[in-house]
């Protein structure tokens, strides 16, 4: 029964792909749009190999604008396709054509590290450590001295938990390049990806179980023996692949000599990204016109989120509209995401969902009002359309996705110390492997690639890459 059991601690499968119901409405947890899904592009190729591409209900976002940026009383559009992206921004920055050309070439070169051509040649990814050691903000500044353009190019940094003096150009480029290739929304919620994958796993003889929280990883004679589930049941296994945060994985391990204290303290010392406060607005019928692009609002001259400076405020947010059902021209759910560190909700650290008390409810109400006020500054007067409001905080992320500190993206990759935040898929303990958003890059693309790197430890990289590339 090797590699055949998958355990999920929650009722719902899928981590950030979870879609939950509130009052007849679907809410997505984390994946609001996905890139590189056009024919021949990398996510399309992976999903085709997994056998799920033709089963997904997706909607291609607008080519002319898939991300709209509000910055300093002006509006800038990210258009799909590298050329179109460049031409569109040239309307606003006519003297920056050559610099935009250089920027596009730079992010493309990072995106090309994981092309389908590499897969066909038997390589999952080309080595990109140089880009991990390059600052995202620094790279943008080296391309253009125009402050406004620098900020417009960094305006979607919420997607990777952007921190100005830490974020790597690798993450910035990998994620932005993916959306420039093609950007899609899920029409029936992002959880369909998890559900389709589960069908495939089961069809291939695997077992996927929910409400099975791993509470201990068993080790004997410096080798994995299996896991304990919900503090009671023992499941024996030869291998364990953990997609938990490495800090959590290490805390579950039985005592052993293979994993050195120095490694444990390095992992413990790593900083985690900020979390997200999400405001889900359930809209009245036929009231809020659907827009087939995301909106990023920035209230400050500097678009990067700063922990100390912005604590308790809303300096920026992302707005994502749910694709309407049927032929309706109106959206039923609008999600608004804004950065928030765990510090802001630390008072309620020891509580569980639905039992956090009145003060927590009040905190969420005040934050909601602050965000709605922020939206009104940009002309989004939606109060008359709102039927109901549902919110989540970093605590919700912690309790439903098991992240440390309620972090949205896990371990912060710091370009100044790329090796320190780099975690390998293989551990020093025999038959324990790691995967998930804390290794390499987070997000649908990053996690897929990391899963492949983990699997290649079992079947070999060349074999696996060619299987995917020729799917």
Say what each PLM segment does.
Residues 284-392:
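C-terminal segments that line or cap access tunnels to active or ligand-binding sites in enzymes
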Residues 148-160, 164, 380-441:
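A glycine-rich dinucleotide-binding beta-alpha-beta segment and adjacent secondary-structure elements
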Residues 185, 215-329:
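Mid-domain catalytic core of redox enzymes
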Residues 27-63:
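N-terminal FAD cofactor-binding segment of flavoenzymes
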Residues 2-3:
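Short, small-residue-biased leader/transition segments that mark boundaries at the very start
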Residues 174-224:
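Helical element adjacent to the flavin cofactor pocket in flavoenzyme catalytic cores
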Residues 38, 125-136, 178-199, 359-367:
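Short beta-strand to alpha-helix junction loop
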